[in-house]
């Protein structure tokens, strides 16, 4: 539901902005409000799930996320929409780590756990891809508000299934909260994510950006120091083994490279080409099909070959696909210049979703599954925030440069602006492709486990910090 919402809202935003009179300067806040609370509270949410009870927190997160979605669906102004999106992020920060940690503690057999992680990763990929098509259809025929309302029935079904099938689990022993760690981590993450979002508007050198980013990193550094000293840390540094660190680092970089894709391609289809919301959603069909096929295949392969080859090949394919997409222009054949690159990329990403979710919780002690799950989601959100800001900066710079160098051309201004926008998209995609390529190398070098190790406990795993 969380990944579905992230992609479905991208398609709905242009219509929502028009209905609620949201200016271009404030457009990003519909996304930023969600990222702020989701990224800022994930680590705390993971620990709450461990201590209060993963099933209880999972169901509470589901219910709150659904209620916030309904609030956003009835929004009458931009402030109400932003508030609802912030609440969605807050409840999502409880829901996401609780869901992943429940898998880890529910499936104790190594092969069954590997299959469960594979299914979780596959569903994450499928949810994101289906959201693009569903968002277009809902926006076109029922209105953008239904892109938020749709979460309510999904949550009801999920809660009923959880009541019937999920047993409660929580840690025993010392469950005192690491208050200094919670404060420094949460405020630090909020500051970094907010500062990065400001950078996409005001630039990386602006005081409005670094005035938040720098203090945020100071607080996060202090958080690491605190975690090394306290007896019951919010995030136990013992979790940062070579293998899990590789999974987290590759997740951070791959999210940095990918998050701008959906935003830019949505504007390419709707703004540059003038497609309707439903047609724009259908243009993502090759991406959706590729995710479904590759995630399904990878979920069967994971217990047989392990995550290392699956993740490495997947990230490499995604990098190649995004590089091919950087040859985009206004007048190019859809099949060869859009559909084929998207298909290549998605055939890789489906594998990545499966491999990363299983590796991030590899050999995690039951006491720490919520914290480990939270860090995986945190790296994804922080990487996405950085990636979107960096790619927006690249896009804006490339657009301005293109207009400056082509303004003397005998070409109508609307057509010239369209060409300039696509040139900006291409430059942003090249950066994203590089980030994915580096992520593939990291995954290959650091995630050195095979199928035989998936269910074994490795006492010799090196801790990085």
Model-identified regions with their sequence ranges:
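C-terminal membrane-cytosol helix-exit motif in multi-pass small-molecule transporters
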Residues: 152-170, 186-198, 215-230, 439-449
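Transmembrane-helix bundle of Major Facilitator Superfamily
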Residues: 1-164, 298, 305, 326, ...
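Flexible interhelical linker loops that connect adjacent transmembrane helices
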Residues: 159-186, 228-243, 303-304, 454-458
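Intrinsic disorder in cytosolic terminal tails and internal cytosolic loops
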Residues: 171, 411-418, 446-465
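Hydrophobic alpha-helix/TM-entry signal in multi-pass membrane transporters
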Residues: 58, 65, 81, 177, ...
């Amino acid at each position: 539901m969380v990944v579905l919402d992230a992609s479905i809202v991208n398609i709905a935003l242009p219509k929502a902005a028009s209905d609620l009179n949201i200016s271009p300067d404030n457009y990003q806040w519909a996304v930023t409000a969600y990222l702020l609370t989701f990224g800022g509270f994930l680590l705390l949410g993971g620990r709450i799930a461990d201590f209060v009870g993963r099933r209880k927190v999972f169901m509470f997160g589901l219910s709150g996320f659904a209620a916030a979605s309904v609030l956003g669906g009835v929004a009458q102004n931009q402030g109400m929409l932003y508030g609802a999106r912030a609440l969605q992020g807050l409840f999502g920060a409880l829901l996401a780590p609780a869901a992943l940690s429940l898998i880890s503690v529910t499936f104790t057999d190594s092969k069954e756990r590997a299959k469960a992680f594979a299914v979780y990763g596959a569903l994450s990929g499928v949810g994101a891809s289906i959201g693009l098509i569903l968002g277009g259809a809902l926006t076109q025929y029922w209105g953008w508000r239904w892109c938020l309302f749709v979460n309510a029935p999904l949550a009801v079904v999920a809660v009923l299934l959880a009541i019937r099938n999920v047993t409660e689990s929580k840690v025993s022993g010392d469950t005192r909260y690491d208050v200094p760690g919670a404060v420094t981590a949460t405020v630090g993450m909020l500051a970094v994510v907010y500062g990065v979002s400001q950078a996409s508007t005001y630039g990386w050198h602006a005081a409005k950006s670094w005035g938040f980013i720098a203090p945020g990193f100071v607080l996060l550094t202090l958080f690491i120091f605190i975690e090394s000293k306290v007896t019951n840390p919010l995030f136990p540094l013992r979790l940062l083994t070579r293998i899990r660190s590789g999974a987290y680092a590759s997740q951070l970089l791959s999210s940095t490279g990918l998050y701008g894709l959906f935003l830019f391609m949505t504007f390419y289809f709707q703004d540059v080409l003038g497609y309707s919301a439903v047609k724009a959603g259908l243009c993502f069909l090759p991406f959706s099909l590729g995710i479904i096929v590759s995630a399904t295949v990878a979920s069967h392969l994971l217990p047989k070959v392990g995550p290392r080859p699956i993740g490495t090949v997947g990230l490499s394919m995604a990098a190649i696909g995004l590089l091919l997409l950087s040859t985009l222009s206004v007048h190019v054949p859809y099949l060869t210049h859009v559909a084929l690159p998207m298909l290549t990329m998605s055939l890789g990403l489906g594998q990545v979703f499966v491999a990363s979710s299983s590796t991030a919780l590899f050999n995690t002690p039951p006491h720490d599954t919520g914290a480990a799950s939270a860090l995986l989601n945190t790296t994804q959100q922080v990487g996405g925030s950085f990636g979107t800001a960096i790619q927006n900066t690249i896009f804006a710079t490339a657009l301005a440069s293109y207009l400056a160098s082509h303004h003397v051309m005998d070409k109508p201004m609307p057509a010239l602006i369209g060409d300039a926008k696509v040139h900006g998209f291409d430059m942003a995609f090249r950066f994203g492709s590089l980030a994915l390529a580096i992520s593939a190398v990291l995954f290959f070098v650091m995630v050195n486990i095979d199928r035989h190790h998936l269910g074994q406990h490795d006492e010799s795993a090196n801790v990085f910090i």
